[in-house]
Amino acid sequence: GEGALVMIDNFVNDPAYKALLDKVNIVIVPRINPDGSYLFSRATYDGFDMNRDHMSLKAAELAQLHTAYRLFMSEVVLDTHEFTFYGAYNDDWTSAGEYMENADDLETTPATSLNNNPAVTKIGLDMAKRAFSDATNAGLRVNHYGTTVNNPIGRAYFGLFNAVSFLIETRGIGAGRQTFERRVFSQEVAATSYITYAAEHADEIMKAVAAARADVVAKGKTYEESDVLALYQTKSGKTLTDYTAATVQYSVADGSEKVSKASPLSLNDTLTRSRVRPTAYVIPADTANIEKILYIMDNQGAEYYKLNAGTTASLQQYYYVGDYMVNGKAKGIEAGLRDTADVTFASGAYVFPMDQVASNVIAMLCEPDVTDSNGYDGTLYQYKQIDYDKSTMNFPLYRYTGNDPRTTLVSNGTSAEPTQPTQPEKPSQPASSDTYTVVSGDSLWKIASKQLGNGSRWTEIYDLNKDTVKSPSVIFV
């Protein structure tokens, strides 16, 4: 939080920082966990670790953060954290000993998942390389923070939107106010480096991110066997960063320094498990926990529509295969796909088409067996919002592989419910009797999803209700 406040002060009072604002727009959320911070706790007051919760959204604060992000859809995201000083160890790393684990001031790495656009990943690695150089020149000890393809973690989550996403970690947890100025300075140096690079390469970054997001939308409209989703990513050791870092340690006995060999970071480059991207996911409307599932999807920015009761569609159903074993130990589950068959939904069903910017997030939620997020409630199954039938082994979850699902996967039942959202050239003007009663927890996005079938149409509601809705981010109940 303090590092963010320093950056705000810089942009208000420092001419060099103010000049950057001619090239970039910056949104700063200084702290999303004030209750936990007050209690010196990583978790929220309700016990949720928000940096492991970006997919399941147990914490209301994260749902609000996601809503704020979607207002801007920024091309670059900096996720700032502190790490813990873990004590001192012997060379065998198994017992307390002479040397502290590390003396890093700063650890930082970009999102590098194989589900992200390669051009965006390349920009992230170039920016991290600059940040390493800037930190070293500032007299700081900088290191890699490893990689993560664990989707519930912030750095990886925003990467699924093809943002250039970074984790910035500085020493702090458990340190109280010890070396406080140096810790805040470390945050400032890293954030300044990334923002300066973004300003210098603004056009390149904006074009790359826009192209990546457009590509995701286009791929989601047409089924291609070559277009796969990464479910379990590993490292061959052959794909390395072109920048290196060394670990510095100090003796707790005499203060002597020990420096490791400078090494690059090995990146995830191998698809150990994958599955072809569908054009839509389908969940029956009478599925247990459907309201919670829709809450999650709403706050992930997912567009969806409902099929009428009695609709029949040609789909593949997911089923439980068994534990997925790695080196003799279970690492989550493995799912399979039934042959394509006609399925009739007595109560209707919700369709989540993949021709949208949020499609990577939708896929990582709906695929039951994303090994990358095993143990962190990254999928609807891992979060136990859906489960397989213990007799048939089937999940209440289907995929569609026909092209252009918004026009080919539509209602054909007898219900009088509307089929799917329309996209008029101009917003239709509702009659005076078209009203909606706002309830606690509503947002314009959520209301638009329910009433218009598409959350991104929230601006239509806002434009028609400016007299009563003074701010699009605050609705009074």
Model-assigned labels for residue ranges:
Residues V27, T435-V439, K446, E460-D463, ...:
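Soluble periplasmic/extracytoplasmic beta-strand elements of cell-envelope proteins
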Residues G1-P430:
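Structured catalytic-domain cores with a bias toward divalent-metal coordination
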Residues N454-V477:
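Extracellular LysM carbohydrate-binding repeats and other cell-envelope/extracellular binding modules
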Residues T44-D46, M50, A448, N465, ...:
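Glycine-rich, flexible loop/turn motifs
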